[in-house]
Design a protein with these regions (language model features):
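Conserved catalytic alpha/beta core of Sir2/sirtuin-type deacylases, generalized to analogous enzyme cores
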Residues: 1-151
Length: 151
């Protein structure tokens, strides 16, 4: 969809970067990424493999400080720059496509207030609360729908 010029941005709450790994370019990762971990003291970057392979709590090789995972943990403040960018992208969208999530989702519901476009399309497996807000509702696995559309 991105290559065809039909997709401007993906707003993702997943921390595993599946969209980026799949080749998508403009992805806003709301909750960060497990692939980008940082020492809060000296700023050195560490890979997910370094974190995974550490026998104990991962520490910075340079200064010994505990490495900070690149994801937002429950109770932490969201990055306001990322939230503003996501809101701006939703505001500019002509069509908003929600895949595998709900209009009532705590993560996405606040962004829907910024949507002034023409169509809200929901694709998920089962009926959910507030589905009636959608202009088009498709009750099927999102991956299957995108395959049928050749995306």
């Amino acid at each position: 969809m991105e290559e065809a010029g039909k997709l401007q941005c993906i707003i993702d709450s997943n921390i595993y970067q599946q969209m980026k790994c799949g080749g998508c370019k403009n992805v806003i990762a709301l909750h960060g990424s497990i692939y980008e971990n940082t020492c809060p003291h000296c700023g050195k970057i560490y890979s997910m493999e370094y974190m995974r392979d550490s026998e104990k709590i991962p520490r910075c090789e340079s200064c010994g400080t505990v490495i900070r995972p690149g994801v937002k943990l429950f109770g932490e403040m969201m990055n306001s720059t990322i939230m503003s960018e996501a809101s701006s992208q939703v505001e500019q969208a002509d069509v908003l496509l929600l895949l595998g999530t709900s209009v009532a989702s705590e993560v996405y519901s606040k962004y829907l207030n910024h949507f002034e476009g023409r169509y809200l399309i929901l694709i998920h497996k089962e009926r959910q609360f507030l589905d009636e807000r959608a202009d088009l509702l498709i009750l099927e696995e999102p991956r299957k729908v995108l395959e049928k559309l050749k995306f």
